[in-house]
Structure formats: structure tokens, C-alpha cells
Amino acid sequence: MGDISDSYSGGTPTAGKTEYYGGDIPFIRSAEVNSDSTELFLTEEGLKNSSAKMVNKGDIIYALYGATSGEVGLARLNGAINQAILDIKPHANYDAQFIMQWLRKSKENIIATYLQGGQGNLSGTIVTSLLIDCPTYVEQKKIGDFFADLDTIITLHQRNISLYTKNSITPSQR
């Protein structure tokens, strides 16, 4: 992975410094790698005075720590990341969607290989050492787009099922 991308993780501003929080910069944490919103926001001062790093919408973001280890998504907003997230920027001729889908598919194997009994943390070194066999860029794009479309269809069906379940009348209501 390190041969086909650049990567970095961020950091967390000092928690006791209220002037670092409540600004306009979304602060993406590991439980939010597949979310289009965040609970916390940083100020410019908080970003500047910490090792938090900015990511761009469309970057691959990969959770390294705890219960969310191995969760992966494409950033849905520009924001800052903490040390529990690795930002992965593919080099030219490598498709972010394809790489993200490969990481998603490989999650169980990565965790089984690198985390003892599912405990512990992944690291940027582990992720960049992963070997990924990439087809041509055109094929990567087709594969990545196919799985993105499939994810969209699944999400839409899940929403429909939720709406149907929520709005259905139970036999006791008849």
C-alpha cells in the first residue's frame, strides 16, 4: 500500500483548552469514518496548536484503534482527523474507491493477522505494508464504481425496509 499511496494520521488538541473546540472545522473521529457529520468541531487555533491534520472529501480514511479498527470509508467532508485515523491518498493511476473497497473486503483478514484476539491497534506502518494487487486504472475504476453503486443500492433498500417496518401495521392494530 505504501508504494501506491501517501498516508498520515492526525492528533487531538488538548481537551482542557476550550478555545480549541467549537469552531468550524469538523473533527472526524474513528467512529465517524462513514459519516457525513461529526459531533466535535475544532477552531483554527485548535488545529494549529495540535497534531490534528486535515483531510479532503474523497480521501480514504481508515480507523486504526479500538472497536472501530479496520473500518474504512471515503471522507464525506473536509475536516481534521485524530491519531486514531489514517488518511490515505492514492498516487496517480490508483483509484480511491477501489482501494477503499479492497480494504473493506480485507478487514477480517487484516484484524486476524495483526490484532491479537481482536485486541490492540493497527498502525500506519501495518497499513502501508499491506500488499494490494491492482489491475489497470480503468479496471480499478470499474470495480470501485460497481461496488459503490452496490453500496448505494443496499443503503436504499435498508432505508426502505426501515420505513416499511416503522410504518407497517401489526396484527394487533387491525
Model-predicted regions and their roles:
Residues 29-31, 39-104:
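A short beta-sheet element
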Residues 17-33:
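Short beta-strand/loop turn elements enriched in aromatics
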Residues 1-11, 36:
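Non-catalytic DNA-recognition/assembly elements of restriction-modification systems
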Residues 71, 113-116:
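Short amphipathic beta-strand starts and helix->beta connectors
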Residues 108-109:
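Extracytoplasmic/periplasmic mature domains of Sec-exported, cell-envelope-associated bacterial proteins
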Residues 131-174:
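Amphipathic alpha-helical coiled-coil/heptad-repeat segments
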Residues 15, 79-86, 116-141:
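A short glycine-rich beta-alpha junction/loop motif
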